[in-house]
Design a protein with these regions (language model features):
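Short His-Asn-centered micro-motif
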Residues: 25, 53-56
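N-terminal phosphate/diphosphate-binding loop that engages ATP/GTP or pyrophosphate donors
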Residues: 1-31
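Conserved catalytic-core segment of NTP-binding enzymes
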Residues: 3, 31-37, 41-47, 56-157, ...
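Loop/turn-to-beta-strand initiation segments
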Residues: 18-22, 46-52, 79
Length: 172
């Protein structure tokens, strides 16, 4: 799935890549996606210093309210990093959020209300699924201001940046 990143789809491939500092692993799933890796996350944690697991998606939207069964957090997880897209700020909740009705209810807002740092913080605090936050897509002064405002509403480590632009800054 990542052209410049080695990807192990089997245990044998994973063993062959054991010396690589950064890899992708998973089992092929329909639609060109990857699902659970060929070995347990506990085994991966034994081999690598850090294992980053994408717990669930957001149907391409920058904000999300999680269903009761989400995210599936592996028992071996030591940290829970929530990634939020800055491109959702200012958009109506119904356009920016996956599961917009639940998002609006958690935020105490209407579906047509814009997503603000305050509404995003309200959703995150209500769900309590994170212990640190990364705000991606911080590519404009407006996005950086929203990131800084979001950080003021949270009590955990918060970083922001743009993976596209290669910019990163810790805010809290």
């Amino acid at each position: 799935p990542f052209p410049d990143l080695p990807c192990a789809r089997t245990a044998a491939e994973l063993n062959a890549l054991a010396g690589e500092p950064l890899i992708c692993t998973g089992t092929d799933a329909p639609g060109g996606k990857l699902t659970v890796p060929p070995v347990s996350l506990t085994e991966l944690a034994r081999i690598y210093d850090y294992v980053l697991v994408e717990a669930d998606g957001s149907a391409g939207r920058p904000m999300k309210a999680h269903a009761a069964h989400e995210p599936v957090i592996p028992p071996a997880a030591r940290r829970r990093l929530l990634v939020v897209g800055a491109s959702g700020f200012g958009l109506p909740i119904e356009k920016a959020a996956h599961r917009p009705e639940r998002y609006a209810a958690l935020a105490g807002a209407a579906l047509t209300d814009p997503v603000t740092p305050q509404t995003q913080a309200a959703v995150m605090l209500a769900e309590n699924l994170h212990d640190s936050v990364y705000l991606n897509q911080a590519e404009t002064p407006t996005a950086w201001a929203a990131a800084e405002e979001l950080a003021r509403h949270l009590e955990c480590p918060v970083a922001a940046g743009s993976l596209h632009q290669g910019v990163f800054r810790r805010l809290r």
